[in-house]
Amino acid sequence: MESTLSLVVAIAAITICITAFAIYTAFGPPSKNLQDPYEMHED
């Protein structure tokens, strides 16, 4: 039972860390380095 709980907590922590990193990359200071392919392509 305790090993199951620790596994669930570990998976939840990894998921939260990945989500936080994605939000930081999308909206934080690194977002200035992201490029929009639709703005780069002119018709």
From Swiss-Prot:
Q: Transmembrane ranges?
A: 7-27
Q: How does it sit in the membrane?
A: Single-pass membrane protein
Pfam families, from UniProt?
Answer: PsbN (PF02468)
Superkingdom assignment: Bacteria
Please state where this protein is localized. Cellular thylakoid membrane
Q: Name one GO cellular component term.
A: plasma membrane-derived thylakoid membrane
Which UniProt key words apply to this protein? Membrane, Thylakoid, Transmembrane, Transmembrane helix
A Gene Ontology annotation in the biological process aspect, one of them, is: photosynthesis
The primary location reported for this protein is membrane
NCBIfam families, per database record: PRK13183.1
Q: Which family does it belong to?
A: Belongs to the PsbN family.
Give the function comment from the record.
Answer: May play a role in photosystem I and II biogenesis.
What name has this protein been given in UniProt?
Protein PsbN
Q: Which gene encodes it?
A: psbN
